[in-house]
From Swiss-Prot:
Positions of post-translational Phosphoserine modification: 123, 127, 215-216, 219
Region Disordered, annotated ranges: 1-21, 106-133, 146-260
Short name of any one Pfam family annotated for the protein: MMtag
Cross-link (Glycyl lysine isopeptide (Lys-Gly) (interchain with G-Cter in SUMO2)), chain numbering: 22, 104, 113
Protein name, entry field: Multiple myeloma tumor-associated protein 2 homolog
Domain of life: Eukaryota
Compositionally biased tracts (Basic residues): 183-206
This protein's record includes keyword Ubl conjugation: yes
Naturally occurring in which organism (per UniProt): Mus musculus (Mouse)
InterPro entries in the record: MMTA2_N, MMTAG2-like
Length: 260
């Protein structure tokens, strides 16, 4: 009564097998894919579980070590900036290629010469005690000309080296003092011209000041002259009238009779 009327089996976990799924003809038509039964050319023959495998261990330092190294470098840079620590500058050594080039310039084999025997641009300061400048070289240095100080130093020492005869001064060295005197005379001429110009400017300023003082000084007071109005006929009449008004009437009559 409780059993199924249909034939066959509904299927359970004990009756399921992945091999049957792989070999099924209609597998590609089923919805969904599974790693246990890959389908198609993109899944067959490929490692589908590559992401789950362990990776190779990193050979580099760990994150904590990197952070500690960065903090230490920052601390050293801060101390150097504040002046609590002296920065050590590592000298850059010569490479093999540079050494071979220097030997080629000198014109010898690199095996015959050592690095200590080669004198470069910085050798003048180190061998200043051994190289004595001549009087001509000193004069040239005063004028600002370049002085050749690269002398070859023998390994035996300066005492055993034969003293070379002193060279005679060349014509170029003789010309240098003349050029110096010519420059001095030019400078003196320029100074004289400047002094003359200054003197002229001073004179012009003095003349201008005198002219300004003359123009600004008040003019001398002119003698008082009689006004123009005093000579006019109206003023004459007024004066006569005032004089007549001051006289007695009897006098006025006498004057009029005398005028008649």
């Amino acid at each position: 009564m409780f059993g199924s009327n249909r034939g066959g089996v509904r299927g359970g976990q004990d009756q399921f097998n992945w091999e049957d799924v792989k070999t099924d003809k209609q597998r590609e038509n089923y919805l969904g894919n599974s790693l246990m039964a890959p389908v198609g050319r993109w899944q067959k023959g490929r490692d589908l579980t590559w992401y789950a495998k362990d990776r190779a261990p990193c050979t580099g330092p760990s994150r904590e070590e990197e952070l500690a190294a960065v903090r230490e470098a920052e601390r050293e840079a801060l101390l150097a900036a504040l002046g609590y620590k002296n920065v050590r500058k590592q000298p850059t050594g010569l490479s093999k290629e540079d050494f071979v080039e220097i030997c080629k310039r000198e014109g010898g084999d690199p095996e015959e010469k050592g690095v200590d025997r080669l004198l470069g641009l910085g050798s003048a300061s180190g061998s200043a005690g051994r190289v004595a400048l001549s009087r001509e070289d000193k004069e040239a240095a005063k004028l600002g000309l370049s002085v050749f100080t690269h002398h070859r130093v023998d390994s035996e020492g300066p005492s055993t080296a034969p003293t070379a005869p002193r060279k005679k001064p060349r014509a170029e060295d003789k010309v240098e003092p003349d050029a110096e005197s010519h420059k001095k005379s030019k400078k003196e001429k320029k100074k004289k011209k400047k002094k003359h110009k200054k003197h002229k400017k001073k004179k012009d300023k003095e003349h201008k000041r005198e002219a300004d003082s003359c123009s600004s000084s008040p003019s001398p007071p002119r003698p008082r002259h009689q006004r123009h109005s005093d000579f006019s006929p109206c003023s004459k009449r007024k004066r006569e009238h005032s004089q007549d008004s001051g006289r007695n009437p009897s006098r006025r009559r006498q004057d009029r009779s005398s005028d008649d």
